[in-house]
Amino acid sequence: MQNNHPELFVISAPSGAGKSTLIKKFLSSNNNFELSVSATTRPPRDGEVDGVHYQFISDDKFKSLEDEGAFIEFAQVHNHRYGTLKSFIDKKFVQGKSIILDIDVQGFMQIKNSNILNSSIFILPPSFKELKKRLEDRKSDTNSAINKRMANAREEVQYYGEYDFVIVNDDVEEAIKTFENIIFTKNHSLNKNLIEKILQDMLSY
């Protein structure tokens, strides 16, 4: 079924907060939504498909598109560039698809400061300790990399107030219900005391 009023939803979270899991669960049962496919200058990893996981382009092509104003947001991460093409969003809107845009705070602030209409959600972990445990349980990062992600998380959580909605991902099933409620009703009561407690925990750990 086509969506007559497609929308853009921007989702951000510290690494380990469970953002990817929530998005994946939501998309698996909502066919009118698609995950935005970013353009990047980094080479494909094993198993990645051009146009599915990313749009892989050269540095020169990226620079050309940037000069043309083709991106709604872009950033440099670990010596590679990433960006969201306006043409991709427009194409999906014409098809009646709403877009889930999974980006960091830096990218979101570019969109927030533009005239692009969107609804935004920031996902918080229940505590600093739980965030670190989730990162360690992945068993994919070195201790140094985990510490770097935790340091980044401290910076990122301070921007939660810039977003329209905040979800505390303590229980996945409850979090996905809240996620869906926000997407479909634009309504969610924020427990400010809980948010402040989490922030104090993360910033003072």
Regions found by a protein language model. Name each.
Residues 19:
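Conserved lysine of the Walker
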Residues 22-23:
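Post-Walker A alpha-helix
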Residues 31-44:
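Short beta-strand-centered segment that lines the nucleotide-binding/catalytic pocket of NTP-utilizing
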Residues 2, 140-141, 155-205:
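NTP-dependent small-molecule kinase module
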Residues 1-8:
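Extreme N-terminal, non-catalytic leader segments
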Residues 99-104, 113-138, 168-169:
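Conserved phosphate-donor/acceptor-positioning beta-strand/loop module used by diverse small-molecule
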Residues 13-15:
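The conserved Walker
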Residues 42-99, 105-109:
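ATP-dependent small-molecule kinase phosphotransfer cores
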